[in-house]
């Protein structure tokens, strides 16, 4: 098959018009979430899937001694509670979806044993011109998360960019230089430096960080994620559930309901587009350098960086994340943060933190801004 032959669907004005009809319509007939409840196992699987061993999430006896009296779920656990918020986009069949960011506010902690319901709807469609694939549609969803007491726990937006796979592969320029580089290779010394950061990673825990001890310009400890491996991506999917990962009869039923979902593999078997996270060949067909990480995974790493810093008595109030590039297998991310300001609002004290995540070549992968509520000695 010639490389220039069209293999996948295009973004058309007709398909966009059909999708626009769904704006502000509640999403009801959709996949059930991976998790309904913050059980001990669900929370631990989620935390371990993002490489987070904080005992506040993973050790119920430890959590029982916290000021909440119970273990908590990490703020990013919301990704496991609603598929639409996690990138299960509707419309534009055969057009790829790249998860690209979130803007979330948390109102209450998620406690061990809490049960959740959610509401979600398509909020907007915004057209962009991109280096990755030319014409792209930013598909924005709004979601609300409620606990068993019908209390609003969190609310916010997430978005994917819908891109034409053929256009990205054949005419996209974003990764021209990356594709020309030699494959990354790590020496023992390279790995030793990465592993030293893991060894030094500090979980603040029960050593309370007070607002009086924080000032603008304070640096957060560098957090490393990687080197990226398919094994790591699968570890995340184990806690998150994936979007299209199904087996046997359930895989068949999914393709019966969504025939445009199946992309034949090298054996001629229709399989899901989520394979871009573990198959280099399909990743190349959609225009990326190699198999790459999940967007919700990377957003969760940014929140992990903040929860490590804030300690058990802090609370993440807000996080906005922009994903700027893919992290293919072999990449390593270095997450850094700095306190931008300290402020008071409604009688509570907050630190605003700006974050960046650069890969091993110094290329920007993520930028984010978070607000953390901290206790005061006063």
Regions found by a protein language model. Name each.
Residues 1-22, 101, 106-216, 222, ...:
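HotDog/MaoC-like acyl-thioester-processing domains
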Residues 2-101, 167-313, 377:
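Hot-dog-fold acyl-thioester-processing enzymes
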Residues 277, 289-293, 297-344, 355-360:
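Catalytic-pocket segment enriched in acidic/His residues
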């Amino acid at each position: 098959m010639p490389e220039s032959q069209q293999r996948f669907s295009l973004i058309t004005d007709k398909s966009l018009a059909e999708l626009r009809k769904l704006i502000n319509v509640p999403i009801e007939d959709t996949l059930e979430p991976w998790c309904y409840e913050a059980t001990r196992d669900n929370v631990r699987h989620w935390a371990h899937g993002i490489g987070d061993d904080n005992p506040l999430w993973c050790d119920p006896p430890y959590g029982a001694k916290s000021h909440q009296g119970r273990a908590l779920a990490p703020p990013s656990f919301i990704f496991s509670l609603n598929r639409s918020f996690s990138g299960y986009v509707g419309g534009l069949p055969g057009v790829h979806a790249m998860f690209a960011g979130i803007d979330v506010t948390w109102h209450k902690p998620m406690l061990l044993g809490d049960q959740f319901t959610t509401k979600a709807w398509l909020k907007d469609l915004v057209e962009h011109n991109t280096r990755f694939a030319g014409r792209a549609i930013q598909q924005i969803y709004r979601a609300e998360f409620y606990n068993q007491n019908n209390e609003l726990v969190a609310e916010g937006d997430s978005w994917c960019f819908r891109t034409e796979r053929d256009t990205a592969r054949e005419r996209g320029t974003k990764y021209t230089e990356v594709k020309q580089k030699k494959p990354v290779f790590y020496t023992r010394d390279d790995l030793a430096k990465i592993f030293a950061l893991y060894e030094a990673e500090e979980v603040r825990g029960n050593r309370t960080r007070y607002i009086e001890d924080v000032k603008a310009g304070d640096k957060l400890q560098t957090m490393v994620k990687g080197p990226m491996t398919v094994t790591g991506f699968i570890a995340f999917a184990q806690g998150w559930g994936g979007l299209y990962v199904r087996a046997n009869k359930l895989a068949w039923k999914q393709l019966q309901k969504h025939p445009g979902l199946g992309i034949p593999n090298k054996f001629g078997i229709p399989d899901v587009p989520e394979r871009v996270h573990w198959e280099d060949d399909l990743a190349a067909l959609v225009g990326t350098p190699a198999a790459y990480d999940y967007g919700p995974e990377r957003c969760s790493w940014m929140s992990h960086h903040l929860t490590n810093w804030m300690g058990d008595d802090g609370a993440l109030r807000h996080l906005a994340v922009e994903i700027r590039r893919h992290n293919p297998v072999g990449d390593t991310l270095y997450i850094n943060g700095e306190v931008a300001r300290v402020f008071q609002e409604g009688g509570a004290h907050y630190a605003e933190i700006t974050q960046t995540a650069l890969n091993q070549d110094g290329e920007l992968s993520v930028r984010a801004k978070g607000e953390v509520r901290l206790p005061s000695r006063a």
